[in-house]
């Protein structure tokens, strides 16, 4: 590999750090969700974008919400637990059972997100990637295999229109 190859090399995942965070995600999820060990897990996040217009100044502000997302194929349930990037704590779980939701689908544009409408008034958009490098905003975890399994579950056994 020449100089240019080293200069433009993609960042590499620190698997030790990723594994430690995956274990911490599991610990938090299992403490919060009854029967948590029966669920498979991925890291996901939500984006809340607000726009502003002050005369000549226009813009937007984005808030990121970190999520531990668990799914169980046996009863077609997704559980979402809010957390923070350093995994120092988490909030209360929200359950989405396929039999109880209004609709669920994958939205490819403008962002690749898994959208769940539990009713007509609310929804959650779960964004998930195999790895995100920004540790200040996101949980540092590599999850290519888990994300592929979640995508398969969501698209083939959970989605409904």
For the regions a protein language model found, what residue spans apply to each?
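Anionic N-terminal interaction surfaces
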Residues: 2-73
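Terminal and domain-flanking low-complexity segments
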Residues: 5-16, 26, 133-161
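Short linear sequence elements within intrinsically disordered, low-complexity coil regions
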Residues: 34, 44, 100-101, 145, ...
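A structural detector for beta-sheet-dominated domains
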Residues: 42, 107, 117, 140-142
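Residue-level detector of solvent-exposed, low-hydrophobicity positions
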Residues: 46, 50-52, 61, 78, ...
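Phosphoinositide-binding peripheral membrane targeting modules
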Residues: 55-117, 123, 132, 153
């Amino acid at each position: 590999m020449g100089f240019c190859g080293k200069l433009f090399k993609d960042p590499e995942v620190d698997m030790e750090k990723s594994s430690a965070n995956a274990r911490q995600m599991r610990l938090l999820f299992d403490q919060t969700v009854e029967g948590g060990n029966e669920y498979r897990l991925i890291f996901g996040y939500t984006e809340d974008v607000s726009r502003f217009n002050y005369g000549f100044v226009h813009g937007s502000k984005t808030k990121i919400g970190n999520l531990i997302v668990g799914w169980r194929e046996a009863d077609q349930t997704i559980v979402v637990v809010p957390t923070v990037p350093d995994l120092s704590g988490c909030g209360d779980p929200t359950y989405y059972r396929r039999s109880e939701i209004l609709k669920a689908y994958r939205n490819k544009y403008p962002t690749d997100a898994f959208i769940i409408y539990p009713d007509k008034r609310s929804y959650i958009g779960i964004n998930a990637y195999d790895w995100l490098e920004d540790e200040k905003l996101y949980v540092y975890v590599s999850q290519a295999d888990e994300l592929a399994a979640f995508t398969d579950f969501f698209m083939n056994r959970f989605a409904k229109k």
